[in-house]
């Protein structure tokens, strides 16, 4: 069985590799996407990637996921801590959701410790660097498989 997974990235992630590499690493978003594609092939999954610095774009992609995606992997970035609108959009999605953060948001500034998205996420992966995306893909295919067999 093949699964379609939306991978949604929020603000400033288009600058991976340039923005605070000591915190986020040296890989670009395109590098991350290439690595994810390789992982997805091993697990018979297809990916659709989205990135925007605009909250409304992320919401539109979450809405679109309802029509075709088996699961959503989302790194809402700074919107994690501020966006009830993204939480509300995710609440409408009926499949599994994995929230990914490159850094461990719980060891950073206090305002980053709370994520609205976590309230709806099936799982949260944080602090593994960009490898967190590949972990999320592996776990998402497990979750999608469990839903199909139950």
What do these predicted regions represent?
Residues 1-5:
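Extreme N-terminal starter segment of soluble prokaryotic enzymes
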Residues 49, 107-150:
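Short, glycine-/small-residue-rich phosphate/pyrophosphate-handling segment
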